[in-house]
From Swiss-Prot:
Ca(2+) binds at Y27, G29, G31, D48. It catalyses: a 1,2-diacyl-sn-glycero-3-phosphocholine + H2O = a 1-acyl-sn-glycero-3-phosphocholine + a fatty acid + H(+). This is Acidic phospholipase A2 natratoxin. Disulfide bonds join C11-C71, C26-C118, C28-C44, C43-C99, C50-C92, C60-C85, C78-C90. One of its GO terms (molecular function) is calcium ion binding. It comes from the Eukaryota. SMART domains: PA2c. Binds 1 Ca(2+) ion. Its EC number is 3.1.1.4.
Length: 119
């Protein structure tokens, strides 16, 4: 769920607030369209697509689905015992948090004009 995703981001990118990723580029945050502005925004586009795939699992609501995972020294592990939906959502969030950690953050791409830059 979104709370767990926030915690995963804080695990892999402890130097930044999770909020910095909530309104970044064209895809980080609610919705998404157009061409990603950079690698970090591409991470969010992939995450959005991953959630779309997870939603194809019967009764799976990624934004609200809880799952079992562990954060140890910046390393994320989705635990066994998750059902198909929980496992899929956990993996979406884990891969995005790892992607965020490896992508440069450009302050100028925070809170951009979506209408002008994301067509």
């Amino acid at each position: 769920n979104l709370y767990q995703f926030k915690n995963m981001i804080q695990c892999t990118v402890p130097s930044r607030s999770w909020w910095d990723f909530a309104d970044y580029g064209c895809y980080c945050g609610k919705g998404g369209s157009g061409t990603p502005v950079d690698d970090l925004d591409r991470c969010c586009q992939v995450h959005d697509n991953c959630y779309n795939e997870a939603e194809k699992i019967s009764g799976c609501w990624p934004y609200f689905k809880t799952y079992s995972y562990e954060c140890s020294q910046g390393t994320l592990t989705c635990k066994g015992g998750n059902n198909a939906c929980a496992a899929a959502v956990c993996d979406c969030d884990r891969l995005a948090a790892i992607c965020f950690a490896g992508a440069p953050y450009t302050d100028a791409n925070y809170n951009i004009d979506l209408k002008a830059r994301c067509q």
